[in-house]
Design a protein with these regions (language model features):
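A short helix/loop element that forms part of the nucleotide-sugar donor recognition site in Leloir-type
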Residues: 119-134
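Donor nucleotide-activated moiety binding/catalytic core segment of transferases
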Residues: 105, 109-113, 117, 172-198
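A short beta-strand/loop micro-motif in the catalytic core of glycosyltransferases
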Residues: 83-90
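Catalytic donor nucleotide-activated moiety binding site of glycosyltransferases and closely related
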Residues: 60-65, 96-97, 144-145, 151-189
Length: 198
């Protein structure tokens, strides 16, 4: 997937190589889901390695909280104040970051929503499971990161509420117990994931 859909710069893992990126690029873009969540903060995503004279932009960045803990506010001010532009995917996040940095932080769409329906359909047709698993009858598609009882209970409630019996489950961790009649996917790529959602 990554090789097909992205054009990557050479991998930079040591501080010296990361520092050299400043000579190779004149603009740096960061963003997306929870990159600035204070409970899992890594200043790398605040582009701490980028020199002051370089242009830094954050698109659809996310903090996923309604306030930044006081003991971390100086970190946010230090690194985000030098950004040329900050766009956040959450309205609350935009307000919090504006107040901290003194910058105008606009709220924008999640990048997933920037493509139209036809583009997503074309994308999904690249999957390995397309046409191998029928999607012509109604189904509930579940994506589980863990294996928690409340998720399975919620699934049963949804099945009853909508009268849909077919369930397709993709789980990162193998479920501890498999419910008879459900379809379990052990390997689905990103294209397949989108295929099941459309």
């Amino acid at each position: 997937f990554l090789k097909n859909e992205f054009c990557f710069a050479p991998l930079a893992t040591c501080p010296k190589d990361i520092e050299l990126l400043n000579k190779q690029y004149d603009k740096f873009l960061t963003g997306s889901d929870q990159i600035w969540n204070p409970y899992n903060l890594d200043t790398f995503y605040m582009l701490d390695f980028v020199k002051e004279d370089q242009k830094k932009i954050a698109y659809s960045s996310s903090i996923a909280v309604s306030r930044i803990p006081e003991e971390q506010q100086d970190i946010y001010k230090k690194y985000l104040s030098s950004f040329s532009a900050i766009f956040c995917r959450e309205e609350t996040g935009s307000k919090v970051l504006s107040a901290l940095t003194g910058k105008t932080v606009k709220t924008v769409l999640d990048p997933v929503l920037l493509l139209d329906e036809n583009s997503w359909i074309q994308f999904s047709h690249k999957g390995s499971l397309v046409n191998r698993i029928s999607v012509s009858t109604p189904y509930i598609f579940c994506y589980f990161i863990g294996d928690k009882d409340f998720e399975w209970k919620a699934l049963e409630t949804i099945k009853k509420q909508y009268g849909i019996n077919r369930v397709i489950v993709f789980s990162v961790a193998p479920p501890t117990c498999k419910i008879v009649g459900y379809e379990y996917l052990q390997s689905a790529d990103i294209y397949d994931f989108v295929w099941f959602l459309h």
